[in-house]
Each structure stands twice: as structure tokens, then as C-alpha cells.
């Protein structure tokens, strides 16, 4: 059964981890307090604030307390949906202002054409919000790459470390598990995808990176179908 869709992780796979950690995260952490104060009555932001209170079990938390909670989650790199949604909204402003462009590895940019020529579908799956993924790929160093994607999955689909998230992706795109290839640098994600029946490849871009028993590539140029 041939591969008909490729699902790619972002950080460490299509995008340099340092761009996420050294550019995007610090930018959102610095902008977060003012952004919440200026937009607390925006419906989407208001919903995120309510979700933070619910998750933290602090229904009466003030806005200042919500900001404290979010900053703690940033420090802990929590994969919380309201945090990821707010980060995406903040990054949207940063991209629009030209504060930065989205880093994408050149080998992935080059591989996209071959993937589409094979009539394969292309999806991304990240703990960052789908909106943040669209921003990354639409404001990339190589321009707007989003027309090449058939969809983006985030924490609303499920936790990347658990099988159910990948089962949900398979159900959403209506393909057999073995028709889907998942590429990530994280062993635990590959394990979960494999448990769901997907084919897997580990992206190994850095020396000393944790590796397992999965087939490995160090560049999208090594993809063969």
C-alpha cells in the first residue's frame, strides 16, 4: 500500500528549534502582558482567559494572575491550548509588523515540489496552534508555502505523545494508516504514530540527537517513495 499523505512535525523537522526557542517564544513572552491587557475583551482572547482559569482551577483569577500563570506555562513549555492560541495571535502581530520571518529548512522547501508531483497530500502536526503553523509557513523565508498544505493539526487533535491523536488524524484525512507517513525528530511522537499504524521516519538533524530503532533521514532530500 503506497504512501498517499505525509504529516510533518514542525520544530526540529521543518523548522530550526532555535527559531522557536530563541525568537518566537521570547517574543510572545515579552508581548503577552500588554497583549492581554489590550485585548481582554476580544472574544477569542476572553475565551482563552476563561480556559486558563479552568485549567489552573482558579475561576476567580484576576487578569494579572492569569498573566502569571501563562508566563509560568511558557517557562515550563506547557502544551496548553489557550497558551498556544494566544502565542499564535501574538506571533501574527509580529509577522505582520515584519519583526521576523518563519524559518524553514531549505531541504523541506525543495522537497515540497516532489511531494506534490507525486500527488501526495501534505499536512503539518504541531503542539503550536494551527493558526501559528499557517503563520510560520505563510511568512517563511521562501514566501507563502501554505498553498502546498492540505491541512494543519494541533493540540485540539490530541496530544502528540499519544496514539489517539494520530488515530484522529487518520480518521480526519480518511486514509488507511499505512498510507500515511509521519516525520518527526521526537522518538515518543514516532512511537505514538507507529502504534496508530502510520509509517514513520525520524528526522535527525543534529549530532548527539536521541535516536531509536526508526528509519532515519537527516534531510528531506533523502525522501524516497
Swiss-Prot record:
Top enzyme category: hydrolase
One record GO biological process: L-methionine salvage from methylthioadenosine
Cofactor binding, per record: Binds 1 Mg(2+) ion per subunit.
InterPro entries with a match to the protein in the record: Enolase-ppase_E1 (IPR023943), HAD-like_sf (IPR036412), HAD-SF_hydro_IA (IPR006439), HAD_sf (IPR023214)
UniProt pathway: Amino-acid biosynthesis; L-methionine biosynthesis via salvage pathway; L-methionine from S-methyl-5-thio-alpha-D-ribose 1-phosphate: step 3/6; Amino-acid biosynthesis; L-methionine biosynthesis via salvage pathway; L-methionine from S-methyl-5-thio-alpha-D-ribose 1-phosphate: step 4/6
Family: Belongs to the HAD-like hydrolase superfamily. MasA/MtnC family.
Role, per record: Bifunctional enzyme that catalyzes the enolization of 2,3-diketo-5-methylthiopentyl-1-phosphate (DK-MTP-1-P) into the intermediate 2-hydroxy-3-keto-5-methylthiopentenyl-1-phosphate (HK-MTPenyl-1-P), which is then dephosphorylated to form the acireductone 1,2-dihydroxy-3-keto-5-methylthiopentene (DHK-MTPene).
Record's protein name: Enolase-phosphatase E1
Organism: Shewanella sediminis (strain HAW-EB3)
Taxonomic lineage from the root: Bacteria, Pseudomonadati, Pseudomonadota, Gammaproteobacteria, Alteromonadales
Gene: mtnC
Amino acid at each position: 500500500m503506497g504512501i498517499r499523505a505525509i504529516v510533518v512535525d514542525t520544530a526540529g523537522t521543518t523548522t530550526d528549534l532555535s527559531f522557536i526557542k530563541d525568537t518566537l517564544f521570547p517574543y510572545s513572552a515579552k508581548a503577552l502582558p500588554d497583549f492581554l491587557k489590550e485585548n481582554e475583551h476580544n472574544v477569542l482572547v476572553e475565551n482563552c482567559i476563561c480556559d486558563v482559569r479552568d485549567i489552573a482551577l482558579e475561576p476567580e483569577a484576576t487578569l494579572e494572575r492569569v498573566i502569571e500563570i501563562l508566563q509560568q506555562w511558557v517557562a515550563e513549555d506547557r502544551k496548553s491550548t489557550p497558551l498556544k492560541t494566544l502565542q499564535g495571535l501574538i506571533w501574527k502581530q509580529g509577522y505582520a509588523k515584519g519583526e521576523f520571518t518563519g524559518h524553514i529548512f531549505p531541504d523541506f522547501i525543495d522537497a515540497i515540489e516532489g511531494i506534490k508531483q507525486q500527488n501526495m497530500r501534505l499536512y503539518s502536526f504541531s503542539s503550536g496552534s494551527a493558526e501559528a503553523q499557517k503563520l510560520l509557513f505563510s511568512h517563511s523565508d521562501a514566501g507563502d508555502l501554505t498553498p502546498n498544505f492540505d491541512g494543519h493539526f494541533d493540540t485540539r487533535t490530541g496530544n502528540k505523545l499519544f496514539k489517539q491523536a494520530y488515530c484522529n488524524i487518520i480518521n480526519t484525512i480518511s486514509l488507511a494508516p499505512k498510507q500515511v507517513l509521519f516525520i518527526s525528530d521526537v522518538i515518543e511522537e514516532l512511537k505514538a504514530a507507529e502504534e496508530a499504524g502510520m509509517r514513520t521516519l525520524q528526522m535527525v538533524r543534529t549530532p548527539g540527537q536521541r535516536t531509536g530503532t526508526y528509519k532515519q533521514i537527516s534531510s528531506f532530500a533523502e525522501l524516497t517513495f
